[in-house]
């Protein structure tokens, strides 16, 4: 299920990832969702791809996500 806005993201992402990181996650997830439409693991793959995109721009220091 694609996310239309950042408000639709899982609460753990909304509460811990900066807004720009949420944008990256949402856009990447939605793109991967379309790319893997025929894969039975579509949602799992889309989440992994989206997290990888966030981790290219941000890193987690303690409990905070900060720009690299």
Regions found by a protein language model. Name each.
Residues 1-68:
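C-terminal alpha-helical interaction appendages
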């Amino acid at each position: 299920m694609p996310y239309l806005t950042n408000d639709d993201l899982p609460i753990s992402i909304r509460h811990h990832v900066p807004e720009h990181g949420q944008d990256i996650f949402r856009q990447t997830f939605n793109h991967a969702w379309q790319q893997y439409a025929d894969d039975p693991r579509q949602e799992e793959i889309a989440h992994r791809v989206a997290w990888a995109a966030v981790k290219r721009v941000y890193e987690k220091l303690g409990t905070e996500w900060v720009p690299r």
